[in-house]
Amino acid sequence: MELRPYQWEVILPALEGKNIIIWLPTGAGKTRAAAFVAKRHLETVDRGKVVVLVNRVHLVSQHAEEFRRMLDKHWTVTTLSGDMGSRAGFGLMARSHDLLICTAELLQLALNSSEEDEHVELREFSLIVVDECHHTHKDTVYNTILSRYLEQKLKKAEPLPQVLGLTASPGTGGATKLQGAIDHILQLCANLDTCHIMSPKNCYSQLLMHNPKPCKQYDLCQRRAQDPFGDLIKKLMNQIHQQLEMPDLKQQFGTQMYEQQVVQLCKDAAEAGLQEQRVYALHLRRYNDALFIHDTVRARDALDMLQDFYDRERTTKTQMVRAESWLLKLFDDHKNVLGQLAARGPENPKLEMLERILLKQFGSPGHTRGIIFTRTRQTASSLLLWLRQQPCLQTVGIKPQMLIGAGNTSQSTHMTQKDQQEVIQEFRDGILSLLVATSVAEEGLDIAQCNVVVRYGLLTNEISMVQARGRARAGQSVYSFLATEGSREMKRELTNEALEVLMEKAVAAVQKMDPDEFKAKIRDLQQASLVKRAARAAHREIQQGQFLPEHVQLLCINCMVAVGYGSDLRKVEGTHHVNVNPNFSVYYTTSQNPVVINKVFKDWRPGGTIRCSNCGEVWGFQMIYKSVTLPVLKIGSILLETPRGKIQAKKWSRVPFSIPVFDILQDCTQSLSELSLD
């Protein structure tokens, strides 16, 4: 499989064993170029071993196809991802294959594992390929892995693998001035330990010929001239504000700023023990969500979301404070009027504009395939329903489906990773002609026939803009940005265009740097990064040592009943936090049906949802780990009562006490008879 001249140009330093970043536009063949580097590496390096890291599960199989096409049959290739379930250990798989394609999270777990079959060291690989390497920053999994690499490099302890980064959009890191953008690019190079960021120079004209940009159009609409449904929602929010008796609370309903305000109010109220204030804040957030949905899709979709929320409140809450009863009555008193307004209210101008775009594109001769990008799973689900209910869209042969993340929350729909793969394949095969997608499809998704991309009212950064645009792969493709005239989304898209130009200037400036100056700068940045990481680790250690675990009580976030102590908690696989006290079971009830988690795990499977037996608040779910059933707690459902007051932590990693790793023998032997066995 031959490379194009511009691909040859960008991989030359990598063929010499140097660490580089390949910067090519989406659709220009970064993966094929990387596969060729891997092939040459295995052919020339004694006992070479390659690992390809991706940040999305669906990219594992997509990349495997590309690498297998490039490699000779005698090179063994395997894939590992979070949806594989029971499998051999990561270490065993790595040691028995020449090339491994996996999600970065699995490599990180293997690096930290103490099990011989699972554990692996970076030195066991001779080449690391980092797909979408612009994510190598801050505390991402990519950067955690590469920080380990840098620590070993600066210690000069052992030979290290070659690094090859791939990106279409290094970004500006939030910078709006050239020097800030240059600093961001240099930091990315330092994090990946690269000596060059490579893009075509001599073969640039050939790149443009093979990879033309889609035609961009701004499709702008006006706001609803009248909005009785939205006005009534805001009136109800005003009534809740009156109950709160907080005149300083800003009433910028339907904005992200307002959402942040009520989220903070909810946290502050929980820590102050103000149950009713917390409940009002929670419900205000739901009404604000309804305004978001109403602005994006239809009033009936917003009302359906509110109805689902209040139905769940009724069926799950076994104990209610006065505020909850008042809020339920408020909704009940107005839901019929809201229903009438939703049924006869004006159509959303954004949907009318979207219909015109789709009719024009899909009504043209030829085979059209498109992707609509939207902000949330909820709006993706609502858009799909709307698409299926428009007779005129059916007449032009639109066959839509959703492509969303594999999460699981009570507030939104979700897809299994198997579902994702099937949808992507059906889109490739032409069984489906239109995807309604969240950001899960922005990066790496390679469908050559896709010729229409619509960004539907999105407020994102320049990287997301470049990535979404790059899904339009076919010739004469159209990239539509659909938003309300004068909206924040429109202003942000214009800013993104300016930032894309700034990014290109910053990369060019870094490429022109004197090699010695570049090396010195990278070395300084790497040393500074490790110092900062060590300082953060020391800070975390101090933070986690503030209190003894047995001095911290665990309270239900809703009813504030004490249900355990910090000393009851253990960590499983680094991310799940379980309560190992056998007496804890008296404080919760369990649903009969297991929760849906859209992965199959190696050592455990999910059980039922667990709820506070006093008030019905959802705390988490059961984990059946190596036949032992353990309750997993969500940090958002637990309030911590410390010797200095109540705390609602955002993450378990930020609680003010240490949580040891779960040891099945030590933690379960004494009370095994009392624990539930599968």
Swiss-Prot record:
UniProt note: phenotype after gene disruption: Embryonic lethality at a high frequency. Adult female that survive show an enlarged uterus filled with fluid resulting from vaginal atresia.
Domain of life: Eukaryota
Coiled coil: 489-546
Induction: By interferon (IFN), virus infection, or intracellular dsRNA.
Keywords: Antiviral defense, ATP-binding, Coiled coil, Cytoplasm, Helicase, Hydrolase, Immunity, Innate immunity, Metal-binding, Nucleotide-binding, RNA-binding, Zinc
Subunit and partners: Monomer in the absence of dsRNA. Homodimer in the presence of dsRNA. Interacts with RIGI (via CARD domain), MAVS/IPS1 and DDX60. Found in a complex with RIGI and IFIH1/MDA5. Interacts with ANKRD17. Directly interacts with ATG5 and ATG12, either as ATG5 and ATG12 monomers or as ATG12-ATG5 conjugates.
Xref: PANTHER family: ATP-DEPENDENT RNA HELICASE DHX58, HELICASE WITH DEATH DOMAIN-RELATED
Limits of the Helicase C-terminal domain: 353-514
Helicase ATP-binding domain: residues covered: 11-188
Cited Pfam families: Helicase_C (PF00271), ResIII (PF04851), RIG-I_C (PF18119), RIG-I_C-RD (PF11648)
Motif (DECH box): 131-134
The keyword Repeat is annotated on this UniProt entry: no
UniProt source species: Mus musculus (Mouse)
Tissue: Highly expressed in mammary tissues. Expressed in liver and testis. Expressed at lower level in spleen, embryo, mammary gland and breast tumors.
Reactions listed under catalytic activity: ATP + H2O = ADP + phosphate + H(+)
Keyword Ion transport on entry: no
Lineage, broadest ranks: Eukaryota, Metazoa, Chordata, Craniata, Vertebrata
E.C. number: 3.6.4.13
Domain notes: The RLR CTR domain is capable of inhibiting dimerization and signaling of RIGI and also facilitates binding of dsRNA.
Entry similarity comment: Belongs to the helicase family. RLR subfamily.
Any one Gene Ontology molecular-function term assigned to this protein's record: zinc ion binding
Protein name: ATP-dependent RNA helicase DHX58
Domain RLR CTR per the UniProt entry, residue ranges: 542-669
Cell compartments where the protein resides: Cytoplasm
